[in-house]
Amino acid sequence: AYCMEKVEDDFMEVAPTDPKDVVRFVKEVPYWTAQKHGKKYRLMYQVYTLPKYIEHGKKFFEGVNERYTEYAKRLEPKIGIPYTVITPLIFIFVRACVHYAMFEDEYYLQTQMEVLKQGVALFADKYKANQA
């Protein structure tokens, strides 16, 4: 579990808290995490999908769900999108980053990033209109 926690801590250390930094973060982090964590992700997935260790993996990811939801709650007032919408967007982003780090699948990464960009723009417009 330490390895998984370390990777997540590294990821959260560079996570933006300023909306102006989100675009840079989204562009850079998939490549950064592939270089820094690719081997660790592959090892972790091998270990935590084994029947012997699956419960440890489930427990870790329960905590991930809580931590990412808390991060989304901190972003909500800054970007004006409810945390209940931000949280699944974070999950999609992280999944795309992990997939890229493990397999260096540029097509998968870019298609996920494109839908995230469009989704965030649509949600931002929707919630700005609701506030007006």
What are these regions (language model features)?
Residues 1-2:
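HTH DNA-binding helix-turn interface
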